[in-house]
Amino acid sequence: MKHILCYGDSNTHGYIPSGGRYDDDTRYTGILAKLLGSDYRIIEEGLNSRTSSFDDPFEPYKNGMDCLVPCLDSHKPLDLTILMLGSNDMKVYFSPSVEKIAGSLAKVCQTILMVSEAPVLLVSPIYLGDNMADSDFAASFPPSSIAISHELGGALEEVARQLDIPFLDAAKVTLPSKEDSLHSVSYT
């Protein structure tokens, strides 16, 4: 049996923009499990508000690097880690930039490669929606964050190329919800 760890934020967790959590079969991890079949075990490690490596002053314990190594160790042996972080790194109080976020995610990928000794699939986050100003998250994600979300995919594709790992741009396969402009619409 192959073991795949999905390490991410609220979009991995399955956060529903109107509140709650998508059921197992609706979250991307559940869809992946169904598509791959019984020879694969999908391990879901999605945490709302998780950052790649930044300490959130309003939501402590969300720094993705802090729990990464224990998480990898607890799920060994792994055949693949799917890493989808970066959305929360765009919060205004982190003084975000494409370079800063890409650099942070490069370090996360390097840590995964070193600790798990298994491949990493780096997934760029979805775009932040154009109606973010009307969202409950508007104070954390100003227009500059929306611009970063549209540039991040290219920078992360370059990170993946440099690390010789596969890459997927989630913004090319799903959209932000109209409800909050941050979380993905249902994957089904």
Describe the predicted segments one by one.
Residues 1-60, 70-77, 81, 155, ...:
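Serine-esterase "nucleophile elbow" of acetyl-processing enzymes
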Residues 38, 62-187:
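Alpha-helical cap/lid subdomain in secreted, periplasmic
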